[in-house]
Amino acid sequence: MSASNLLPMISSNPAQFAQASLAKAFAPRVAQGQQSVLSFEAMLSTNMLDRIGPLASREDLPPPDAESTLEDLQKDPLALLPPHMRAAIESMDQTPQSAVVIDDHYVAPAPIQSSRITWNGGSLTKPELQIVAVLNRHKDLCPLSWESLEAKANDPSTPPDLKAAIEALLQDPELFYAIGSQGDGRCGGKISAKDLSEFSKHHPQVAAFQESQAQSYAQNYIPSDSAENAQPSVMTENDALRELYRYSEYLPKNLSLADFKQIVDGEAKTGKCPPQVIAAAQYFVSHPEEWKQLYGGNIDKVHKEDFLQVASSSMSLTQAELDTLKTINSHQELFFGSGDLTRDKLASMADDKSLDPKVREAASQLLSDPLLFGLLNNAITGYKTHHGFFDFGGGHTVDSGNVSKEDFGRFYTNMTTANRTVQQPKFHVPETEAAQNAVADMKMGLADQPDIKSPKKNGGALMHVVDSVLRVGSKVLDWAATAVGVLSFIPGIGQVADLVSMTLACEAQAANLLRTAITGGNMKQALIEAGIGVAAQAVGLVSGPGVKLAIRNGLARKAIEEAATAGINLPLSMAQHYAEGYLNDLKARLAADHPA
């Protein structure tokens, strides 16, 4: 019996284990003594007969019973031991079981530094490569702290593949330390998305492992919007376009063959990246000409918005999607009679039992289909940034969540041949272990659906000029950088912008400074609270409504300068109008992200 098989027996009842072991050990000795016992009892019987003489015959004595003696010893082998040893073993029954149970799930109190694997070197085992590969697919859930791992693993909302990876990572504190110690070799107890990307760059093993996985994913592809019992097929260009469109919110701002290679290798700045997206990236890495042909044959690197625009007219819809469009077209009054189509409205229609079953089915299908919803939602506005200079702050909104009757009409009447052509995949049965593993990962990806895309205000050149400095257009606003940029237009503070940047300790301080400046509050007090000192002669310039005016005029001057560079004569009044709109938009975002 192996040691592992013994452990459960020892843990469940130590006294019984000891007794059983002793019985086994002493059985040979008992068997060997059987003849002695018989001889001894025979001798004893003869002696007794000699002594009692005629009082009894030989047949009246009980026959010797060595078998019963052996059975008694087997039932109680401890009887052969000295009293003190027997008492010690019997006392084991009184010992709490928890005192001898071996814990197979011990978790180190903190990540452990190791020379076996470091932030930029060492060799990973295959299980460790699998852990890293799964973490790279879920960078949207970073940072992950060591203390939070158990809670994350037990969270019902955690995707099943990530749950398994976290449970394995808890048993590998050395790997956690190596990933979380990027740059200086010191781990602060957390793993960020950047840490994962850098760790992957520094360990070629990761790229080799993930490239092998990606190739298998592309050969055993299951769509992320398919049913759980779907069979795999070889990925096509249409499949790749659909997956990249569905998960575009998590892709890098620019897309190229090099960017796709980074996605495959785990080095890209991605968010949610299920195996379906990795397969799509691998598809274009393997078919570079098909990628370039989307843009005329010569272009490689494009803005993500340009890709979405091209993909929307190049991809094929499913039969279910075409049926949904047909139903909506024939019931436009139901879908658009009371206004734009929203997700809430679709949910209500899907639950309304008084409606035609086909209408309810169409509402339900569109509600659960972010790809088709996005195509309709952006049919008129598109995805590309307007290039008109004066679109500052007043451009359209991408992914607004509101589908108008005009949006639907534009898409439905302008569908391309590709849109109307339903693809017929050729399914196959995965036979090799690699193929079966790929299918298992693909099915894990079904549990990692894209979130609803956030509305994005679009604008023109002026908006992007200011955005390059203030970063207001980014999805996650850097409030500290924004504060430094905006406050730099205030006389007396612009000269100490570096001090402001270094002093701001948190987002709350930056948000408070911005709010005070935009609303004309006590700027001097806000600066003091943030620990920023301002020269006495500048005090009068940083208080009251004059602060907002100074910022607005500074933004306006910047706009006029950039307009002149672009060969455009921008009137001061119009520049001030755009700057005012910019500040109002900033104020609204402050209220949403950092309410007072």
Curated annotation (Swiss-Prot):
InterPro entries referenced in this protein's UniProt entry, alphabetically: NolX
GO cellular-component term (any): extracellular region
The entry's keywords: Nodulation, Plasmid, Secreted
Pfam families on file: NolX (PF05819)
Subcellular location field: Secreted
Protein name (database record): Nodulation outer protein X
Organism: Sinorhizobium fredii (strain NBRC 101917 / NGR234)
Upper taxonomic lineage: Bacteria, Pseudomonadati, Pseudomonadota, Alphaproteobacteria, Hyphomicrobiales
Gene coding for it: nopX
